[in-house]
Amino acid sequence: MSYRRELEKYRDLDEDEILGALTEEELRTLENELDELDPDNALLPAGLRQKDQTTKAPTGPFKREELLDHLEKQAKEFKDREDLVPYTGEKRGKVWVPKQKPLDPVLESVTLEPELEEALANASDAELCDIAAILGMHTLMSNQQYYQALSSSSIMNKEGLNSVIKPTQYKPVPDEEPNSTDVEETLERIKNNDPKLEEVNLNNIRNIPIPTLKAYAEALKENSYVKKFSIVGTRSNDPVAYALAEMLKENKVLKTLNVESNFISGAGILRLVEALPYNTSLVEMKIDNQSQPLGNKVEMEIVSMLEKNATLLKFGYHFTQQGPRLRASNAMMNNNDLVRKRRLADLTGPIIPKCRSGV
């Protein structure tokens, strides 16, 4: 309370009256103190923070040329410092003499048989090119000329050694034809349980609506003939993955499911993998190359579900971590080993898988 009482007596003070009573020197001192209290003052450059330290009037105008002349005259009048050891002009060491370049040896003339000299004298550039290839002088020609000369008995290099090198003729590759699958017709055939329809390929058809893809998953629940279902590059997302997961829990015929290159997140992938224990017919699943990485946690959960499944033989996904990759590889290897044992023993009942680590 006493502190508040002390502040009340300063409440009615007139600041203009106090500042008007200060002298010029006191105002300058107050200004310097206020600048030091300014928090933004520390962020200014040094040249702007620093105030004038003196008010002394200049003794004369600034003349740059006269100042330079004065400095030059003062430098000339200053006596140079004498050397501690006087220079005598004595030369030490040997005078450098450049080495003479070796003379090129004179090439001796090679004497050939008259028939060879006449043949080489009348040979064309194309014939000389083939002769150089036969003699192994491949540095004188391009690779194409060299191999053409060796692969044929006739003269193939018509251009000669000094010709312009031509590139290999480009063979145009035609673009892949678009997917010709009729989406609506195929959906009706699945709903009607068409026995001739065993593979559904909707790859790279980007204009399929999400409700239509969910309708495909709903129709596959009761279908008894479709064994392969692929929707690569159809912009499928999590709702489609959820519908496919529900389909896997009821479908008992589908063997291959491919959902690569889509927009399915980790939650959708997990839902698909969690449906594997309810499905005993699926032997291959591909989920790689989604729009976003799944992450280490999702990969570990995927591996845990794969280790509990004894029917899946192929799993298409590239694990980013070494641990999940090794565990998934071992799980698929064990499942394939069970199939091999069942085939060799010709068993009809289920085989109990051997114990696995982490299950």
Swiss-Prot record:
One CC-aspect GO term: sarcomere
GO MF annotations in UniProt: actin binding; tropomyosin binding
Region (Disordered): 36-61
A biological process term (GO) from this entry: actin filament organization
Keyword terms: Actin-binding, Cytoplasm, Cytoskeleton
UniProt keyword annotation of Cytoplasm present: yes
Complex and partners: Binds to the N-terminus of tropomyosin and to actin. Interacts with FLII.
The name this protein goes by in its record: Tropomodulin-1
Organism: Homo sapiens (Human)
